[in-house]
Swiss-Prot record:
PROSITE patterns, sorted: C_TYPE_LECTIN_1, C_TYPE_LECTIN_2, FN2_1, FN2_2, RICIN_B_LECTIN
Protein's recorded name: C-type mannose receptor 2
Tissues/organs with expression: Ubiquitous with low expression in brain, placenta, lung, kidney, pancreas, spleen, thymus and colon. Expressed in endothelial cells, fibroblasts and macrophages. Highly expressed in fetal lung and kidney.
Extracellular side: 31-1414
Main location: membrane
Organism, scientific name: Homo sapiens
Length: 1479
């Protein structure tokens, strides 16, 4: 046995092994993991056309086997959460070795660790990776960064076995939990429970049989869970039932989801978000809400860009219960809530905020599609001037009358104002009756009961078709009657006394032998103006369908508007499970779809995730639950039925108005917009570095529309090619990595919940050209808007509330719409000092006003001096129409923290509040106005419409704090604290020593000091970090004798850190030199206030204070903690931190911290935040911390799984979905892609047991080597012996005796890991040997195992030819991580040994002691401990039985607890028990 190898374990260790093994055998339970799991349909086999076999997992390895077997678990795969691919045989996830520069990474099966990036795959590129790693025959790959068009390259060789579907055909969709203790968070699949892995919802652990899942990876560790949604035909579990209407309701008070997530959760239960269509239903809901305090999502939304408010379940919007002043801000708040505080009143809110929600369903409802409208036109007799349709007669009354007079006129003719009950009837009225008339009365009104619309003829309201933002003013008694207007026949509520034409309707007289009118169609064909339609019932290929229609003198069907779509859907209603060919195709595989006639596609009705990613294909209509939706199918192999359409020439009835006229090619573009001679539109990119200038999709759409433009739509490759070139001219043609995470909103979206998850362009252009990035796996339920990715020049699905840049598009020859056309609005900019100002008299909300200012490269005005205030006041008196008129200025509170900010980012150094203003800080954003006749300010709701003032300046503002002083000149007295080149002292520990501001300043002057001046975030961080033991507020040197704040030395205020709602003190008098408002630093226990500033009365309050003076050159400086030396640990409060100063990705930093028995840092409070700010500023580099976002989400959590009680986000953050967080040099938290390399990170060193590792690997490391432990890192173990200075040969021998080899380094991350650990030994050795040799046969360097050196990190001047010889050895420097060549003899270095992780040693009889007496003792101890284990198990199971026996079926519990107060329940404890405990 070589020296250094661990000695044989003594017999007590064998005893413990015996006990554990027998105990495990005793506790083990039969049955394969997941036996109780729900059978899942999304399991598939992966087939390779190139290798002619299926992917199989065996023993941790992956291979392709020619024997495909659908019943063999090792070949069964499924997509699971976080883009991982799960194998049902191994119960593991597909992955590779840790990614590095080595391209020969091994493919294998790994534990499904949540954080491991090497387990994540994109379904579109999985085939490429499998071909590369398994050696399948491949074709060329398109060059990164080029403009692709969704082509399948090597991925096309990999398909789902038994079909032609690609590997994205069975994607994973998030499953949102109900009840439990996870606030509605989605399941984490797979998850571990009771040492078993589950790849779906399970009933294991529950005797009631209800399915549940964990919402974190390991239930046993976190105990986070929820019930799984199930589709059932009853309302027994989790539902309240209204016996009168037979509707069922589910109140999810403890969940917090966005509107779209809540809608998906309801849909997963065969339900929808709550719709309220009757007063009785509102009353019933109010009764269920009694006693609760909550705001909950309902199905009301305004997400259809071409329509108005609607219910997500397609119920008619006929009853409304808006609160007063609602809906407001309709352009940005598109989803509805019901509020208990207003007795069930409704409000509109931003759809992205997280709230509880209510689901609704009808029991015994099926998944069958809604029955189609009746389109058959039965013959009826009508009087002259009346026109027949479906048994009724209709007439246009051209004379303009009020609604009541119009109704009387209809009654005199034997009818009533028209009622509309279907899309078919609406089409007839729009085409045949309305014709060219712009707006007419219809019979809908709410005259009898406010907010409850009904038809004047008494018929049931079963169909509504509102205009965008309508109905919006129903609460006004003057808007009780409804009109129909516009080319699509949408509806608007209007004042009843308005004079308009109208439409009458009455029952018709059935004709003798009344039969359907055929309008000349052949037998078996169906008429719909202006064509005849025929269903071909044979299943044929696309070319055969074309030929068959041609043989009948017709063509495959074209669909040009929503009316034709509704009619065609009615034709195929009874053909469930079938497909029908249409004339839409991409036969040439261009990526653009066209009708066979060559016409452009002006209307589309795609199914979810269609038209997909591949180019080419032909379009068929689906049936069943996807009735009438369009899907792309293979033109040659897929067989479907077909629909022929035969035009009868001249339309019998007028057609709908066509789309807007096609713009001219000769029209000019507005200034600043670009175009190409072949394009009919002009384009402009709106981009800014500032987060506050970026916009959500809805805001970007509004910004374009305010200019008279639309968000970019792309109808062809040529159009997108021009836009790509335009972007390259602006941002440069760099490598894709340079432009990573730079996205631009385009108009493509699937926000409308009634659109079947179909992508649509916001400007109404048909979605016929597609270029989605096939490497993205973004087909989940919540990414409803699309972006153009600058790096790949392709499209990516994104959450609509993400703040991004955008691109607008406007027709040639169109002028950009100015915000104000009045003479006053067109006044020139007025100049004052170094800025220009413009006064806009038209009224806008605060956000709209700010947006208009940005069009002129300006902002809403900021005010920084009395002179500037006087200038504004003087001009306001000229522009204002009333003395008390209010004008918006740029001051506003942030929604994230309630702090006041100027829109231009300038410092708040001047205030002019009116008496009683500003109002106390609340949860709603506040915006500030200036009064015309007085020089004072007030705050009010930002949605109020006011005139406003814009300001622009060419003066550049300092954005970064100044550099640190190079050295501290001198030191501080013993009772003072030194920070850089200043000394500080906190006074006021005793209550009697707390004084007024002037007395504090005098006390400091007596010590040759002054009250502290805080000039940058670094000094502020030092002050805040000094506050944990301070229990009182502290005066600082900031004060205001006039209206502007300044420091005691009359230094201008260049940095501020005001608390939420501050400065808010009384405005100082304009005259007088004595300070009346002075600032304190708050010690508040609230994280939002700690260390912030507040302005207080200088003469009426007493506080502690902080004195400051310069260092004394005669004194020695204190040891400087900043910047810290490499490898040093810093202690603060109860925490210890290690700073990593290396180029690291986030996951690399996490691994490196874990190799130090630490984790990435957790920031629990503003004190620790201030301490880390000093560290980041001292190193002059951003630092990773342990806060990361869930995949594709802006939900962020600590890797240490601590609660997220404190955050330090920069405004607008977290911006990056699924990103990682760093502390920037100014202390603010920002997010970026986890793959970004930053130059440092912060580890939080645990004082207790090592934290659980977030990334796991097979095997373990030996217990120890002499006096040095083995350190695990990825797949290997390392032992550092830098105290031993050995020659190269001796180092090799020592590592061989330990079972390993001298250090080899295979990629950059491994080099960083070694370098980080070597820095701890920098004083003992200048470096460590590398196990590298020169191979004279190949003339190359090889590692000790003869593998080639594919990665290197040579220091200057590099590796010369003279160093490539048998006599050369190589080493790594401790202080730099660089590699050096040198001689093999007469040089000694430290030793680092490396060996692969080993599997846990199995139990072996040879490990038992040989002494018979010892054996007897072992066996007796085993029996004794086994008896104890058995007793414990019986008690445990009895307790389980008691817990579960108290609950026979999960009962629905409507709890009013907030999420933070919600009781966290183990899955084995029933809801009933928890309710009883609370009572």
């Amino acid at each position: 046995m070589g020296p250094g190898r661990p000695a044989p374990a003594p017999w007590p260790r064998h005893l413990l092994r015996c006990v554990l093994l027998l105990g495990c055998l005793h506790l083990g339970r039969p049955g394969a993991p997941g036996d109780a799991a729900l059978p899942e349909p999304n399991v598939f086999l992966i087939f390779s056309h190139g290798l002619q076999g299926c992917l199989e997992a065996q023993g941790g390895q992956v291979r392709v086997t020619p024997a495909c077997n659908t019943s063999l678990p090792a070949q069964r795969w499924k997509w699971v959460s976080r883009n991982r691919l799960f194998n049902l045989g191994t119960m593991q996830c597909l992955g590779t070795g840790w990614p590095g520069t080595n391209t020969t990474a091994s493919l294998g099966m790994y534990e499904c660790d949540r954080e491991a990036l090497n387990l994540r795959w994109h379904c579109r590129t999985l085939g490429d990776q499998l071909s590369l790693l398994l050696g399948a025959r491949t074709s060329n790959i398109s060059k990164p960064g080029t403009l692709e068009r969704g082509d399948q390259t090597r991925s096309g060789q990999w398909r789902i076995y038994g079909s032609e579907e690609d590997l994205c055909a069975l994607p994973y969709h998030e499953v949102y939990t109900i009840q439990g203790n996870s606030h509605g968070k989605p399941c984490t699949i797979p998850f571990k429970y009771d040492n078993q892995w589950f790849h779906g919802c399970t009933s294991t652990g529950r005797e009631d049989g209800h399915l549940w899942c964990a919402t974190t990876q390991d239930y046993g560790k976190d105990e986070r869970w929820g019930f799984c949604p199930i589709k059932s035909n009853d309302c027994e579990t989790f539902w309240d039932k209204d016996q009168l209407t037979d509707s069922c309701y589910q109140f999810n008070f403890q969940s917090t989801l966005s509107w779209r997530e809540a809608w998906a959760s309801c849909e997963q239960q065969g339900a929808d978000l709550l719709s309220i269509t009757e007063i009785h239903e509102q009353t019933y809901i109010n009764g269920l809400l009694t006693g609760y305090s909550s705001t909950l999502w309902i199905g009301l939304n305004d997400l259809d860009t071409s329509g108005g408010w609607q219910w997500s379940d397609n119920s008619p919007l006929k009853y409304l219960n808006w609160e007063s002043d609602q809906p407001d801000n309709p352009s940005e708040e598109n989803c509805g809530v019901i509020r208990t505080e207003s007795s069930g009143g409704w409000q509109n809110r931003d759809c992205s905020i997280a709230l509880p929600y209510v689901c609704k369903k009808k029991p015994n409802a099926t998944a069958e599609p809604t029955p189609p409208d009746r389109w058959a036109n039965v013959k009826v007799e009508c009087e002259p001037s009346w026109q027949p349709f479906q048994g009724h007669c209709y007439r246009l009354q051209a004379e303009k009358r009020s609604w009541q007079e119009s109704k009387k006129a209809c009654l005199r003719g034997g009818g009533d104002l028209v009622s509309i009950h279907s899309m078919a009837e609406l089409e007839f009225i729009t085409k045949q009756i309305k014709q060219e008339v712009e707006e007419l009365w219809i019979g809908l009104n709410d005259l009898k009961l406010q907010m409850n619309f009904e038809w004047s003829d008494g018929s049931l309201v079963s169909f509504t078709h509102w205009h965008p933002f309508e109905p919006n003013n129903f609460r006004d008694s003057l808007e009780d009657c409804v009109t129909i207007w516009g080319p699509e026949g949408r509806w608007n509520d209007s004042p009843c006394n308005q004079s308009l034409p109208s439409i009458c309707k009455k029952a018709g007289q059935l004709s003798q032998g009344a039969a359907e009118e055929d309008h000349g169609c052949r037998k078996g064909w169906t008429w719909h103006s202006p064509s005849c339609y025929w269903l071909g019932e044979d299943q044929v290929t696309y070319s055969e369908a074309r030929r068959l229609c041609t043989d009948h003198g017709s063509q495959l069907v074209t669909i040009t508007n929503r009316f034709e779509q509704a009619f065609v859907s009615s034709l195929i209603y009874n053909w469930e499970g079938e497909y029908f060919w249409t004339a839409l195709q991409d036969l040439n595989s261009t990526g653009s779809f066209f009708w066979l006639s060559g016409d452009e596609v002006m209307y589309t009705h795609w199914n979810r995730d269609q038209p997909g990613y591949s180019r080419g294909g032909c379009v068929a209509l689906a049936t069943g639950s996807a009735m009438g939706l369009w899907e792309v199918k293979n033109c040659t192999s897929f067989r479907a039925r077909y629909i022929c359409r035969q035009s009868l020439g001249t339309p019998v009835t007028p057609e709908l108005p066509g789309p807007d006229p096609t713009p001219s090619l000769t029209g000019s573009c507005p200034q600043g917009w670009a175009s190409d001679t072949k394009l009919r539109y002009c384009y402009k990119v709106f981009s800014s570095e500032r987060l506050q200038d970026k916009k959500s999709w809805v805001q970007a759409q509004g910004a374009c529309q305010e200019l008279g433009a639309q968000l970019l739509s792309l109808a062809s490759y040529e159009e997108e090619h021009f836009v790509a070139n335009m972007l390259n001219k602006i941002f440069g043609e760099s490598e894709p990595e340079i432009h990573e995470q730079h996205w631009f909103w385009i108009g493509l979206n699937r926000r409308d919940p009634r659109g079947g998850q179909s992508w649509r362009w916001s400007d109404g252009v048909g979605f016929s050209y597609h270029n989605f990035d096939r490497s993205r796996h973004d087909d989940d339920d919540i990414r409803g808007c699309a972006v153009l990715d600058l790096a790949s020049l392709q499209w990516v699905a994104m959450q609509c509330d993400t703040q991004l840049d955008w691109i607008c598009k406007i027709p040639r020859g169109t002028d950009v719409r100015e915000p104000d056309d009045s003479p006053q609005g067109r006044r020139e900019w007025l100049r004052f000092q170094e800025a220009e100002y413009k006064f806009f008299e038209h009224h806008s909300t605060w956000a709209q006003a700010q947006r208009i200012c940005t069009w002129f490269q300006a902002e809403l005005t900021s005010v920084h001096s009395q002179a500037e205030l006087d200038f504004l006041s003087h001009n306001l008196q000229k522009f204002s129409r009333a003395q008390e008129q209010h004008w918006w200025i740029g001051l506003h509170t942030s929604e994230s923290d309630g702090r006041f900010r100027w829109t231009d980012g300038s410092i708040i150094n001047f205030i002019s509040w009116a008496p009683g203003k500003p109002r106390p800080v609340g949860k709603d954003k506040k915006c500030v106005y200036m009064t015309a006749s007085r020089e004072d300010w007030g705050d009010q709701r930002c949605l109020t419409a006011l005139p406003y003032i814009c300001k622009r300046s060419n003066v550049t503002k300092e954005t970064q704090p100044p550099d640190l002083p190079t050295t501290a000149l001198g030191g501080c007295p013993s009772d003072w604290i030194q920070f850089l080149n200043k000394c500080f002292q906190v006074q006021g520990q005793e209550p009697q020593s707390r004084v007024k501001w002037s007395e504090a300043q005098f006390s400091c002057e007596q010590q040759e000091a002054q009250l502290v001046t805080i000039t940058n975030p670094l000094e502020q961080a030092f002050i805040t970090a000094s506050l944990p033991n301070v229990t009182f507020d502290l005066w600082i040197g900031l004060h205001a004798s006039q209206r502007d704040f300044q420091w005691v030395e009359q230094e201008p205020l260049m940095y501020a850190n005001w608390a939420p709602g501050e400065p808010s003190g009384p405005s100082p008098a304009p005259s007088g030199n004595k300070p009346t408002s002075c600032a304190v630093v708050l010690h508040s226990p609230s994280a939002h206030f700690t260390g912030r500033w507040d302005d207080r009365s200088c003469t009426e309050e007493t506080h502690g204070f902080i004195c400051q003076k310069g260092t004394d050159p005669s004194l020695s400086p204190s040891p400087a903690a900043l910047p810290p030396a490499p490898g040093t640990e810093l202690s603060y409060l109860n925490g210890t931190f290690r700073l990593l100063q290396k180029p690291l990705r986030w996951h690399d930093a996490l691994l490196l911290c874990e190799s130090r028995n630490a984790s990435l840092a957790y920031v629990p409070d503003p004190y620790t935040q201030a301490f880390l700010t000093q560290a980041a500023r001292g190193l002059r580099t951003p630092l990773w911390i342990g806060l990361a976002g869930e995949e594709g989400s802006r939900r962020y959590s600590w890797v240490s799984e601590e609660p997220l009680n404190y955050v330090g986000w920069q405004d607008g953050e977290p911006q990056q979905p699924g990103g990682c967080t760093y502390v920037d040099v100014d202390g603010a938290w920002r997010t970026t892609s986890c793959d970004t390399k930053l130059q440092g990170a912060v580890c939080g060193v645990s004082s207790g047991p090592p934290p659980p590792r977030r990334i796991s690997y097979h095997g373990s490391c030996p217990q120890g080597l002499a006096d040095s432990a083995w350190i695990p890192f990825r797949e290997h173990c390392y032992s550092f012996h830098m105290e031993l200075l050995l020659g190269h040969k001796e180092a090799r021998q020592r590592c061989q005796r330990a079972g390993g080899a001298v250090l080899s380094i295979l990629d950059e991350m491994e080099n960083v890991f070694v370098w980080e650990h070597l820095q701890s030994y920098e004083g003992q050795s200048r470096g460590a040997w590398l196990g590298m040799n020169f191979n004279p046969k190949g003339g190359t360097l090889v590692w000790q195992d003869n593998t080639a050196v594919n990665y290197s990190n040579w220091g200057p001047p590099g590796l010369g030819p003279s160093m490539l010889s048998h006599n050369s050895c190589y080493w790594i420097q401790s202080n730099s991580g660089l590699w050096r060549p040198g001689a093999c003899t007469n040089i000694t270095m430290g030793v680092v040994c490396k060996l692969p992780r080993a599997e846990q040693s199995s139990f072996s009889p040879s490990a038992l002691p040989e002494n018979p007496a010892a054996l007897v003792v072992v066996l007796m101890a085993v029996l004794l401990l086994l008896a104890l284990l058995t007793a414990a198990l019986i008690l445990y199971r009895r307790r389980q039985s008691i817990e579960r026996g108290a609950f026979e079926g999960a009962r629905y519990s409507r709890s009013s607890s907030s999420p933070t107060e919600a009781t966290e329940k183990n899955i084995l404890v029933s809801d009933m028990e928890m309710n009883e405990q609370q009572e």
